[in-house]
């Protein structure tokens, strides 16, 4: 009888050590998984060193954990064993979601002693997140904000040679089958019991899931937790990694896409980001909640600026902190400036991105849309001394992963394919364009995508354009949040932020219902109806005395000034003309631009031109500081339109209709001055 009792006690303690689950191993059948080559079974790997609970720590350490906001790991099932002294039965810990006070749980201590610690009840139907934590214990109340991580400690049965394994379940412990799981090279799917197995070499440092339709993962300071970092880089060591999901109806959803924030603690960038970008995003969050629409976001790279990671002590860690208060799920992809400038190796230089954000490439599903996030910067940084040279392309592992991922996507689906460097170059006025991606990989990827409808989304250029490649594929190259690296805001005293093509700084909003996708460019700090800007060219003369008047600009020759005035210093192009110039920020081939003068419809010509306002607020601003460093001068764009009027002072009605039938209209009264926005705020 004593022996039987001893066995029962031992078995009970083992259950507690495993996180309080009712079964020790799963009923998963460790067969070769779909999407992964079975091959010859490898010899068994090394056992992962088990974590053995030590003696309970002092109560003061628990107080420190809460007050410092450190992570709290709470088991999915059973009881929560807190290995601290000083608790007593009846003590309470209340956790409340920071951004949703209606989600709150009071966890009660059921028993406690200084030998085994305290045992608390656990929350139900909860996957964790950023929470306010209030602990009423030890005769005191302690408050902090922590990421609460719901951990599934369920022991999935091992299979020899498959050293990365685990399961995917919902917050009730029910298995979720058919979920794509990968280590960044191999791809598999969960079986009927929610289990997966990978023969991982662990060289990409993560195991991650492609979050399935109508589910969500927990969010840690705006970053979705769809991944686990390997504990060891030794491929021979077995590692168990389980994932917990919550159901979420998201067939209808909204997506915010931004790129090129380029925060670097210079040119007043942090203030501009805080004053203009963040309130805009907060307004979108509030709007989506009021409409009952699920909202997500994607950041397409160049989120910080590698050159200033060390010079100005602002890196991706700081960027993460600056977005951490958004009540938003933000997926990120790396840009060429998101690499360590002291490291001459593509993979190693991206360590900061992986550490602070997420894997370099991955996929997820929201509603009927399959999202793919890619890393198309092959970073060389020759010599490791801030050279920052790179080329466009994908690693072999990334291509291997992409093939495996797409094999699990239903043909005919809509894919949003995110990357930093664009797939295509901007179009010319006649609508033609060339490709930016190298031909070999471009051809291979487009072949893989040929059975799907694809929207490429990209950044990098600090310009705005949309190219329709064929009936199934198009690209949205999205202007930068920073505009011209925050300089135009700096020069204009925060009255305008412009990209090199004259597009105001902003982001793109996609409204999605099942496979129906609509979009609209949104200018920061302006109403969504602000979609174009019109110039009275007769009053757009740019002169040195008006726009470059500083006495100390001796470096700027008249010839240099004229070169970067972009023709607007010529009277023949300005004061003697009757033309109107219109910059339509998000124009594509299915938009219409119409202009009438006194009821008469005028001929509208699409041209390749340069924006006058950007010419003033970067080119002139730079020269006015006695600098000839034209690092980001005004660039050409083909979303520019020119109209010849019959009179010089007549009003004209400009009507722009986008591809979805939304109409943007302005009655332009002339003469209209070319405003210097550092002095007058008109646009």
Model-derived regions, located:
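Metal-dependent phosphoesterase/phosphodiesterase active-site architecture
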Residues: 155-164, 220-237, 259, 281-287, ...
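Short amphipathic beta-strand segments in non-cytosolic proteins
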Residues: 97-104, 167, 172, 178-189
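N-terminal active-site segment of His-dependent metallophosphoesterases
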Residues: 155-163, 214-310, 683
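Bacterial Sec-dependent N-terminal signal peptides
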Residues: 17-63, 147-160
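Extended active-site neighborhood of metal-dependent phosphoesterases/phosphodiesterases
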Residues: 213-242, 308-409, 436-455, 463-513, ...
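Ser/Thr/Pro-rich low-complexity tracts
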Residues: 35, 52-153
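Short, acidic Ser/Thr/Gly-rich low-complexity loop/linker segments typical of extracellular
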Residues: 109-113, 185-200
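Structural motif
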Residues: 81-86, 155-177
């Amino acid at each position: 009888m004593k022996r039987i009792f001893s066995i029962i006690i031992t078995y009970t303690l083992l259950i507690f050590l495993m996180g309080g689950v009712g079964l020790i191993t799963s009923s998963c059948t460790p067969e070769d998984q779909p999407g992964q080559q079975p091959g010859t079974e490898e010899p068994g790997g090394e056992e992962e060193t088990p974590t053995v609970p030590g003696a309970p720590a002092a109560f003061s350490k628990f107080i420190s954990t809460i007050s410092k906001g450190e992570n709290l790991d709470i088991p999915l099932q059973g009881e929560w064993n807190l290995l601290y002294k000083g608790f007593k039965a009846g003590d309470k810990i209340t956790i409340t979601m920071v951004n949703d006070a209606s989600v709150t749980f009071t966890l009660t201590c059921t028993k406690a002693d200084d030998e085994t610690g305290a045992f608390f009840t656990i929350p139900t139907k909860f996957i964790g997140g950023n929470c306010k934590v209030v602990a009423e214990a030890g005769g005191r109340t302690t408050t902090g904000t922590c990421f609460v991580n719901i951990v599934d400690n369920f022991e999935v049965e091992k299979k020899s040679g498959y050293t990365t394994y685990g399961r995917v379940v919902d917050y009730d412990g029910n298995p979720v089958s058919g979920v794509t799981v990968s280590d960044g090279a191999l791809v598999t799917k969960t079986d009927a019991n929610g289990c997966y197995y990978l023969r991982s070499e662990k060289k990409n440092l993560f195991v991650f899931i492609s979050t399935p339709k109508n589910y969500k993962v927990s969010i840690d300071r705006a970053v979705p937790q769809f991944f686990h970092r390997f504990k060891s880089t030794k491929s021979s060591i077995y590692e168990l990694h389980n994932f917990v999901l919550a159901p979420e109806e998201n067939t209808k959803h909204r997506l915010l896409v931004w790129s090129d924030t380029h925060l670097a603690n210079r040119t007043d960038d942090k203030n501009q980001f805080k004053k203009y970008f963040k309130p805009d995003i907060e307004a979108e969050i509030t709007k989506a909640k009021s409409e009952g629409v699920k909202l997500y976001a994607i950041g397409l790279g160049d989120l910080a600026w590698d050159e200033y990671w060390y010079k100005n002590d602002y890196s991706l860690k700081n960027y993460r902190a600056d977005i951490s208060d958004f009540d938003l799920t933000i997926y990120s992809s790396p840009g060429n400036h998101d690499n360590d400038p002291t490291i001459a190796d593509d993979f190693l230089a991206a360590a900061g991105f992986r550490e602070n954000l997420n894997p370099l490439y991955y996929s997820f599903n929201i509603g009927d849309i399959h999202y793919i996030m890619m890393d198309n910067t092959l970073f060389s940084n020759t010599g490791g001394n801030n050279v920052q040279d790179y080329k466009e392309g994908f690693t072999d592992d990334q291509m291997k992963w992409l093939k495996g991922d797409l094999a699990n996507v239903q043909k005919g689906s809509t894919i949003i394919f995110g990357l930093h460097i664009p797939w295509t170059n901007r179009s010319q006025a006649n609508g033609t364009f060339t490709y930016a991606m190298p031909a070999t990989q471009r051809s291979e990827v487009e072949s893989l995508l040929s059975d799907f409808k694809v929207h490429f989304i990209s950044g990098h250029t600090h310009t705005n354009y949309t190219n329709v490649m064929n009936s199934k594929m198009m690209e949205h190259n999205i202007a930068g949040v920073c505009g011209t690296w925050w300089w135009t805001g700096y020069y204009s005293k925060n009255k305008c932020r412009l990209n090199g093509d004259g597009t105001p700084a902003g982001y793109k909003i996609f409204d999605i219902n099942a496979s129906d996708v609509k979009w609209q460019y949104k200018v920061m700090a302006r109403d969504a109806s602000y979609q174009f800007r019109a110039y009275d060219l007769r009053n757009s003369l740019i002169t040195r005395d008006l726009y470059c008047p500083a006495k100390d600009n001796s470096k700027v020759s008249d010839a240099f000034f004229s070169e970067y005035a972009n023709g607007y210093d010529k009277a023949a192009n300005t004061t003697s003309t009757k033309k109107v110039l219109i910059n339509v920020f998000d124009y594509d081939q299915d938009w219409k631009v119409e202009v009438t003068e006194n009821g008469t419809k005028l001929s509208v010509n699409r041209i390749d031109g340069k924006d006058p306002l950007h010419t003033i607020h970067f080119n002139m601003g730079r020269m006015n500081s006695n600098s000839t460093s034209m690092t980001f001068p005004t660039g050409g764009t083909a979303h520019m339109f020119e109209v010849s009027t019959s009179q010089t002072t007549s009003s004209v009605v400009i009507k722009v209709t986008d591809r979805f039938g939304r109409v943007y209209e302005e009655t332009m009264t002339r003469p209209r001055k070319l405003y210097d926005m550092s002095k007058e705020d008109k646009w």
